[in-house]
Amino acid sequence: MDISGMQINEVQSKLKEYYNVLKMARKPDWEEFSMTAKVALAVMFIVGFVGFVIYILMEILPGALK
């Protein structure tokens, strides 16, 4: 088997793996989707707030230490 044949087999193998994952996947119900969205939104707000606090501290502290 030449190199291109091995690459084709690797691609086919990967496609089979992806297909198997898609067969097992299911659409979440509304409750599960809603909870996931709420958690993601809460995490985004927390990360944003922490970044904002760090930004404010970096703006205030240099002036206070002079």
From Swiss-Prot:
A GO CC term assigned to this protein in UniProt: plasma membrane
One Pfam family, short name: SecE
Disulphide linkage map: none
Main location: membrane
Bilayer topology: Single-pass membrane protein
Keyword Transmembrane: yes
InterPro entries: Prot_translocase_SecE_dom_sf (IPR023391), Translocase_Sec61-g (IPR008158), Translocase_SecE/Sec61-g (IPR001901)
Compartments, as annotated in UniProt: Cell membrane
Transmembrane segments: 41-61
Keywords: Cell membrane, Membrane, Protein transport, Translocation, Transmembrane, Transmembrane helix, Transport
GO biological process, one term: intracellular protein transmembrane transport
GO molecular function annotations of the record: protein transmembrane transporter activity
Protein function: Essential subunit of the Sec protein translocation channel SecYEG. Clamps together the 2 halves of SecY. May contact the channel plug during translocation.
Family the entry assigns: Belongs to the SecE/SEC61-gamma family.
Subunit and partners: Component of the Sec protein translocase complex. Heterotrimer consisting of SecY (alpha), SecG (beta) and SecE (gamma) subunits. The heterotrimers can form oligomers, although 1 heterotrimer is thought to be able to translocate proteins. Interacts with the ribosome. May interact with SecDF, and other proteins may be involved.
Protein name per Swiss-Prot or TrEMBL: Protein translocase subunit SecE
Gene: secE
